[in-house]
Amino acid sequence: WVYQGLILNCFQILPVATAFVGFAIARWQYKGGKKSAAVVTGMAVVLAVWGLFLVVHAGDDWRTAMRYKFLAKETLPDVDQNGVRFTPFDVAYNDMIQKFGSAEFSISRNRMHAVDIDGSVGFVAPVTPEGVVGTFFWKQDGFMVFSDQPGLQPTNRVKRVKQPFASGEGMLILDDIWRSLYLRDPFCFYPEIYYLQVGAEEFVAVAPKIRYAYEFPCYWVPYWAGTTIVDSSGKVDSLTREEAIADPRFKGKRLFPQSLARTIVESQKFDEGFFSGFYQRPGLIRIPVLPGGQQMPYLYRTHDGKDLYVIATEPAGNSSALFRLYMIDAHNGALSVWELDPAKGILGPDRAGERVKSISGYTWGYTHDLLESFPLPHQGILYWKYTVSVISGTGITFTAVVNTTNGEIEIFHSREDFDDWLAGRARKKPQGFTPEMEKEMQDIRALLQGALKKIEKISF
């Protein structure tokens, strides 16, 4: 906390110190009868503090944008058909909770991450001790794992992996994994801990490290400084970026810090200089706020097996057209960008979601909601994939993909139906089968179930 709270924030303390000293001088002048001078001093202090905050905060973004340059791409790589994230984060978490029964342990959505599972995309959440006694004396008791692999039956997607960790999350004082990390390297920042599969039922904790490079006169620029690995025995290995990338256990897997990927893209509003982020100009970007709790970047696997963090941006202002799609290699941090002409009106994620909400028969925001605006490049066309779920996020009502060029919507009522479309196979359900028809069928089933219950009562 000394490093992060004092050293990294030393330049942000400067405006506060300036304000304190300046207003002390103004107060002294006011008491001495120099009221006009006190007013002038006070106004000067306000301007100085505002200017210092501006230089410090915006300057960090500006220097970050100058450090990280994106390679322009002419085309967008197609998605891997076996690596599409079909199940949203919230639905996967609720499925884990439903199948997890324990009074002494718990799983937290804040500790759950999307990672590679059995060669496909999935989710892993650590099983951590619960309660005052448990957090001091019990160990992190393995993981809940959700596999989003195609072809699996819903009952086989969630499993419990028993792998106690000697140093883990939710374990206080000496066994706390955060303590182990900062004892190994106190002069860095660990934005996240997630767990990668290195065997059939074996995982290791992965903690990417971020350090800050000083740039004159008062800027700190973040960079990926390596990765710390903690195994179940509590052994801590600190790897450089090159060592982590070359480690055969993590071949092609997520290593680059997700939060740093977002920071780098956010800084691109200053890509044309310090003042370029403060006025409306061609090329100024914004990252839209998406429906549901999960925001970009999303982890996306290409047809050649690369995992990418993808962040879609729109022109700053009131435009909702897709402008740039930033891609950061989740394994080695390579940067690329796909730029479109906003005048062509390619649908961005928020406006495409409004198209899905135009489907009648659902009370959006009360009974049903959209989850995860997921980018889905397929056969040379970019789609946005949405999951429509009940408001609690406990199940999937249907899945929709929106064509970004013409706004057409495809509806899928099952994972098999979606996989058939993705693979170019003939879909088993008729094209005219709509969400409204599905809702009517659900209502009829509910009426029939109610009638059967009444018959059973009468028979009894």
Label for each model-derived stretch:
Residues W1-F460:
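Soluble extracytoplasmic regions of secretory-pathway and membrane proteins
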